[in-house]
Amino acid sequence: MSKTLTIALSKGRILGETLPLLEKANIVPVEDISKSRKLIFDTNHEHIKLVILRATDVPTYVDHGVADFGVAGKDVLMEASTKNLYELLDLKIAKCRLMTAGVVGQPLPNRRLKVASKFIKTAKAYFAEQGIQADVIKLYGAMELAPIMGLADLIVDIVDTGNTLKANGLEARELIAPISTRLVVNKAAYKTKYSEIEPILEMIRRAVEDNEGK
């Protein structure tokens, strides 16, 4: 009998792009996730279950071995403190950029910078690598307000079209990292459940290649 495999999926935009990809890989929930309040779903494979989580929780569930696989954005993985997972595959969906941004045309001050972001770990590492002294302020939303209101000189945030920045008088500055959705696996599970994991990984890999070949 095959060992049960649990795949942790991120809520939101990523979920909307992940489900069609999984369907191409012949992994389909037995009920409509969008119409259910459930968080755990059976699939057309008796040994595969899907769990719907907040994006930032996906690496934690995989790291602790509660989920075998996880689907999460690279931005979330960069910010997570994990030791027990492998990043196996770039799913090449939900693409965007992690960037610095500031008020249009406003030069940076000649002092220690103030930076607002929800990506504290990544922002600190980036400015340290650049040799720039910066205090990073943790925010949870509406990043665009921080430079406008004088809370910060720059923000570090996800940029898709850039329209939200432009609408608030901001401009994207420096690219920190291109972001896309990744498939991760628990290290122990990859060894103990290899015979179950590898076929699924191959199906998903082919689905990604099929998407790219369009």
From Swiss-Prot:
Q: Name the chemical reaction catalysed here.
A: 1-(5-phospho-beta-D-ribosyl)-ATP + diphosphate = 5-phospho-alpha-D-ribose 1-diphosphate + ATP
Q: What is its main location?
A: cytoplasm
Drop me one GO molecular function for this one.
ATP binding
InterPro entries reported for this sequence: ATP_PRibTrfase_cat, ATP_PRibTrfase_CS, ATP_PRibTrfase_HisG, ATP_PRibTrfase_HisG_short
UniProt KW Secreted keyword: no
Biological process terms from the Gene Ontology for this record are: L-histidine biosynthetic process
Question: Can you say where in the cell this protein is located?
Answer: Cytoplasm
Q: What does this protein do?
A: Catalyzes the condensation of ATP and 5-phosphoribose 1-diphosphate to form N'-(5'-phosphoribosyl)-ATP (PR-ATP). Has a crucial role in the pathway because the rate of histidine biosynthesis seems to be controlled primarily by regulation of HisG enzymatic activity.
Instruction: Give the protein name, as stated in the record.
Output: ATP phosphoribosyltransferase
Recorded source organism is Marinomonas sp. (strain MWYL1)
